[in-house]
Amino acid sequence: IRLIKMLQKFKDPDITANGDKRASVPLIKAKTLWFNTGTLCNIECVNCYIESSPKNDNLVYISPDEVSDFLDQIVERKWATTEIAFTGGEPFLNPNMIEIARRCLEQNYKVLILTNAMLPMMRKSVQKGLLELLKQYNEKLTIRISLDHFKAIFHDTERGKGSYDITI
């Protein structure tokens, strides 16, 4: 009986295993579409919602073609999306992050990338790619750097010893 009840919860996506109507929110105005670029990260933050770390590769990197497919769907569905945002893990560990951002910018979306601004972002190929994108798309590209506190001791408590100095 327990197995049957468990399987029933997957029978109808709108009904819970107890027969109650499942809560839902209709997607009608997605102004910003968020992508998780993968679960790998160069640090381990205690507050990370997805438990990203240097070893957590549970979520594979999203590819440029997958993002392009979603961009096509935005157009097909006539959504009012104006911004594409990326989080992770650390987005700049995804080897395709610059190309992914370029595809979004080429289709006239604003792009927001959340980063810890540490070693992955300091790679020459990433810096070169970002400079090219900034030169061409300037104000359409926003890089938001995670800084948890203006004092190193509190930031480091969240993100690891020494992370404040590296970020700054």
Explain the meaning of each model-derived region:
Residues 3, 7-88, 92-110, 120-123:
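Conserved alpha-helical substructure of the radical SAM core
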Residues 94-168:
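Conserved AdoMet/S-adenosylmethionine-binding subsite of the radical SAM
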